Structures are given as structure tokens and as C-alpha cells.
Amino acid sequence: MKDRVDRKGVKEIVRILRDELPQLRERYGVRSLGIFGSYLRGEHRRRSDLDVLVELDERRLTLLEFVALENYLSDRIGVKVDLVEKSTLKPAIGRRILEEVRPI
């Protein structure tokens, strides 16, 4: 799977996520997405996952819905996605993620 993403690059990942955003808003209540971590910095390895920050609307997803969203994104992008909900960020690491994140 990693090879597909390497050929696409970050621009292609952003395009895929941007194209999916309207459906994600309707189906899961996604307000915004952003990528951060090793893929964004160009430091990913063969088994690296893609870190995606998600902000959801006021409705709460069940654990199964959250996992379904994570799996859907993994399938669409072609690499394992690690989905992080913005409202659950701890102060110290949250600051670092928010400084690094590339909004979609």
C-alpha cells in the first residue's frame, strides 16, 4: 500500500481527502480534516500510518462509526490511517500537532 501513496505524494493525498470531504460531512459529520506526522514531513517508513486530524460536528460518533470512518479513509487513500479527533487532543501534544497540521 505504501508504494501507491509514495507515487501520489502529499498533494494527491490532499486531493483525495478534499474530494471525499462532502460525503464525509454528510455521512459522519466531519467539519474538517488535516494531515500531520511522518507522511507530511516526508519521514514515513514502510509500515508508517497516515496521521489524520478530524474535527466533528456536535453529534458524537459511536466507536464503531469512528472506526468505520478510519477504515473508509484507509481504503480510499491506500494506506493505514490513524484518525485523531481534534477535541481529544491533550494540551502539550495538541499544540505540536496543531502547529504542524496541513488543513484540507
Language-model regions: role of each:
Residues 1-32, 41-46, 57-104:
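Catalytic core of pol beta-like nucleotidyltransferases
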Residues 35:
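Conserved histidines in hydrophobic membrane contexts and catalytic metal-binding motifs
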Residues 38:
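Catalytic DNA-binding helix-loop module of base-excision-repair DNA glycosylases/AP lyases
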Residues 49-51:
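Structural signature of the urease/amidohydrolase superfamily beta/alpha-barrel
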Residues 53-55:
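Short hydrophobic/aromatic beta-strand micro-patches
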